[in-house]
A protein has these predicted regions:
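Compositionally biased terminal segments of proteins
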Residues: 1-212, 251
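Gram-negative host-targeted secretion-system effectors, predominantly Type III and Type IV
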Residues: 200-255
Length: 256
């Protein structure tokens, strides 16, 4: 999916539900923050845009009928899908698990146009990329790990930031979440920790030890090493000189 595809989906969805805003969940919400050219292929592979009418959050309205409208008129196998190649999946908020406070960090993706354009001002409110990654990792499916892993690999997302969001914000669990919540968080944290770069090794103790030796002895470290190496070579040469010539004693020549 490209940003131009997302714009078409937002405009069409807003038109069908007669609202100026929709909230975009799922992987394609990352396009609210980044152009597709800066994203890895794994992040924009899906042609599905998960969304729900914004009135579900702004007024607490029951959007069941509007969600159904989205699925019929701009959903999978709809005329919109067949024409544009992208489709909308209308969802309910209680199917998504997100960090607490996610609604205060939404990124507005507004359709281009002018004040005279009927599509002007139609907006998709996209998840913040860090909140999106938390949601993906709590779900914990293979495709979710692939998505977040690609963003980390390309240095778009820092795993430490995602860990920090989990630990400091906490999780806004949906009432219908069926799985073990503690286990879901533990798995997400473990996966993120495995993606963090290993800490640089600390060689300060070795440096201090070498410094102490150099101060306490008049010879330099290089001289110490040269002396030790020379001694080892002398011993090796001596041992070779006194060794018996087995080929002579046994009366045969060594061959290749």
């Amino acid at each position: 999916v490209k940003r131009s595809d997302l714009e078409k989906a937002v405009v069409a969805a807003c038109g069908w539900v007669e609202e100026s805003q929709v909230v975009i969940f799922g992987s394609q919400s990352v396009l609210g923050s980044y152009d597709e050219a800066s994203l890895p292929e794994e992040a924009i592979r899906s042609m599905e845009v998960d969304m729900t009418p914004a009135s579900a959050f702004t007024t607490g309205a029951d959007v069941t009928e509007k969600v159904s409208t989205l699925n019929v008129w701009v959903g999978e196998d709809s005329p919109f899908h067949l024409r544009h190649g992208v489709y909308v999946e209308g969802i309910h908020r209680d199917t998504v698990v997100l960090p607490l406070g996610w609604e205060n960090r939404l990124v507005a993706f507004t359709a281009s146009g002018t004040g005279d354009d009927q599509n002007y001002g139609r907006t998709g409110l996209c998840l913040h990329p860090i909140d999106l990654c938390v949601s993906k990792l709590i779900a914990g499916r293979e495709k979710d790990h692939e998505f977040v892993g690609a963003l980390i690999r390309d240095n778009i997302i820092d795993p430490a930031e995602v860990l920090d969001r989990i630990d400091k914000a906490g999780i806004d669990w949906s009432s219908g979440y069926p799985d073990n919540r503690d286990l879901a968080v533990s798995r997400a944290r473990s996966w993120l920790q495995s993606k963090q770069a290993p800490a640089a090794e600390d060689y300060s103790d070795i440096a201090r030890a070498l410094s102490t030796v150099s101060r306490s002895h008049p010879r330099t470290i290089r001289e110490h090493l040269r002396t030790n190496t020379s001694g080892a070579q002398d011993k090796s040469e001596t041992a070779h000189d006194v060794g018996p010539d087995l080929s002579t004693e046994r009366g045969y020549d060594l061959t290749d």
